[in-house]
Swiss-Prot record:
The keyword 4Fe-4S does not apply. It comes from the Eukaryota. GO terms for cellular component: cytoplasm; cytosol; nucleus. It comes from Saccharomyces cerevisiae (strain ATCC 204508 / S288c). This is Probable quinone oxidoreductase. Belongs to the zinc-containing alcohol dehydrogenase family. Quinone oxidoreductase subfamily. GO terms for biological process: cellular response to oxidative stress.
Amino acid sequence: MKCTIPEQQKVILIDEIGGYDVIKYEDYPVPSISEEELLIKNKYTGVNYIESYFRKGIYPCEKPYVLGREASGTVVAKGKGVTNFEVGDQVAYISNSTFAQYSKISSQGPVMKLPKGTSDEELKLYAAGLLQVLTALSFTNEAYHVKKGDYVLLFAAAGGVGLILNQLLKMKGAHTIAVASTDEKLKIAKEYGAEYLINASKEDILRQVLKFTNGKGVDASFDSVGKDTFEISLAALKRKGVFVSFGNASGLIPPFSITRLSPKNITLVRPQLYGYIADPEEWKYYSDEFFGLVNSKKLNIKIYKTYPLRDYRTAAADIESRKTVGKLVLEIPQ
């Protein structure tokens, strides 16, 4: 398979901190690769909340910075030292700078070779699910090892990660208490496995949690909201409960005294996916789990909407409005 690789490509980048107006769709150099790297022509890339953290300055990055964290596409060039991939292989992978027509990644991963003949819809599904499914898998295995009978509080239960967590928690036999802002979102969360529902816009979350757990509190809280729900998560946990904080959708959690964890022996963790897949064996384990669950259709990845790459500014506004349900995907121009 021969492919003419251009010198310039279309990307989504930021070169300053700010609002949606700093998001730019521009020409940018196609990256050059080393002897151990792959050059991938992207077809689809997933939209994640983390992009907003770079744009707002919550996470530092060198400017200009091409956004994006996951994609699927085709290998169009490889370094001389690469032996495990061939030009023409279809792949799904996790890397920086995937809001682009071309991205590079080490041949050692995290990248997975897809079966020959993978369809366009499957490419979209893998790009939509890779980061969030692996996040949910690793968090429920390692950040807090969910056990049968556990009561788990889940915020943003109808978001991309939330819907995956609902399904995995049900598979593990946990009782999921889903929190969302509308009855429509809660209905979807229930369809995906939630057992108890709390409408955050009109119900007292803590009161409902204590009601559902007979006053005991939850074994774990999976909280991607951040500032607005931090105190609720702390209060809702039972003795020896685990607080899994993995997002800042409402803003950064203000500084607090660590002694506040002592009265109930609470464990607070702030995990990130990359810490669980850094080793090749870890990557293989979780990517195999991903394929098994998705290809067997045991796990349903709900795609909210697919946008052209140039319309990422609209997608960013949609996901940050916290009104979307499921995953947002960008289609890359070919």
